[in-house]
Amino acid sequence: MADVSLEVTPEKEGKADVGIVGIGVMGGPLTLNMLDKGFTVAIWDLSTEVIEKFVATHSKTYGEAKILGAKTYEDFAKLLCKPRKVLILVPAGKPTDAVIENLMRTLDENDVIVDTGNSHFKDQSKRAEMVEAAGKRFLGMGISGGAEGARKGPAFFPGGTLSIWEDIKPIVEAAAAKASDGRPCVTMCGRGGAGSCVKMYHNAGEYAVLQIWAEAFATLRGFGLDGEQIQGVLNSWRERGALASYMLDITYEVAGQRDADATDGSFLVEHTADMIGSKGTGLWSVQVALDCGVPVPSLAQAVLARQMSMVRPERVDNCRRLQSVVEAPLAAPASDEERERFVEDLYWAVYLSIAASYAQMFQAVRAVDKEFGLEITGNLPRIISTFRAGCILQGAMLEPMTKAFEDNPGIPNLLCAFEKELATGMPGLRATCARLAMGGEPAGVIQASLTYLTTMTRSVLNSAQVVSLQRDVFGRHGFKRLKDGEVTSESYNADWKEMIP
């Protein structure tokens, strides 16, 4: 790398349209994306070697004047035209805070700092206050699409002050994925940490839907299908249209992938450790939703599925000690006709579980918006439209969701947009859950989705009536009455005999 100079010469000063801090899994591809769009990009990374290598490699394609590297934050700032615009692409948490601290030290008044990490929306709101109190400007902006999306065009979820967004908008829109109608997959989500809030719940939905597809795969395996046969089922579902999506596509690839290191031609999934990592956004989403009083059982179960996968030694030990629980294999269909029926039931189980998960996701977003004043709800149709390309959630089911919020922004629950599908598919979902329960196949998100759909469409919950009275017995907590189907405003206590625990 000796031929690469990171010296900031006068001809380089003020030439970069945008700066990228962090040339890693996301920062490198996004830099190349912006170079493709004709922007001059300044880069900084903790490793000078990484900067030198990146500049040396890509200046051959884009020219030395288009990609500019710097060794220090001070030199990095000199490369940028004013007002400076800097995107942070480093791990969330302390690394992000360290970068912001250094940028605040070196940038000038009115310069813009954009954090693209998976940060908690409350943290983004605090950062915005801190940065803007120092005379700089701040946006929190989530990114979806992974490294490939960053390279070819991701979906972006900015949130903060509108005037700040207007300054960075041309660059972000140019780099964003484009939907089939040509619109960039980015929209201003709302105030404060709104962008990070949307990305948080985007990730929670991703957790749930990935787990639903994984549970569908495991169920099909239990029906006796191998990887290629499972691919056949998934392809037939994709061709039906409603479930066509990026997450179906990647599940299809996983199902048929052979293990290159196996001599017997077996599938890679058979040799993959059954432990799912996570970065915390799913858990945050569930915690905040529950704090706001919103039930999100499918989203919660997706988090729990990951947590249970990570305690593998405990699971293996329990498996050895508790064979009576283990020995309940999912019964394979007895005939081709029965298999066809089981697979059709599973189709509806997947469809309705995804619908239930998205319903919970958007109920949570609206409740969090109301609680924290993020001004997201009015933007939901446009936000959902940003999921259409460059985004892990992209899929055909987004269309009826977008239409539902456009036609009725106050729709009580997104489930109301799926009335016909619920009527058609609930028997299949119930039958699938019964088979899974009797066959000992864990499918927490599908089962939780059935619970959500069943509970949230009941006018009276008998179990809730019992628990309300139980609380009055032991704690005199009081209960409301039902009169003509309506809940009374006053509370009551019944006369109970003394029962000392």
Q: Where do the language-model regions lie?
A:
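NAD(P)+-binding Rossmann beta1-loop-alpha1 motif at the extreme N-terminus of oxidoreductases
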Residues: 2-78, 82-84, 106-110, 147-151
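Glycine/threonine-rich flexible loop motifs
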Residues: 85-102
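Rossmann-fold dinucleotide-binding core
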Residues: 97-101, 114, 120-232, 240-266, ...
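Interdomain hinge/lid region at the active-site interface
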Residues: 196, 221-225, 240-355, 403-445
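Small-residue-rich helix-loop
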Residues: 237, 241, 369-407
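C-terminal amphipathic alpha-helical interaction region
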Residues: 423, 428-501
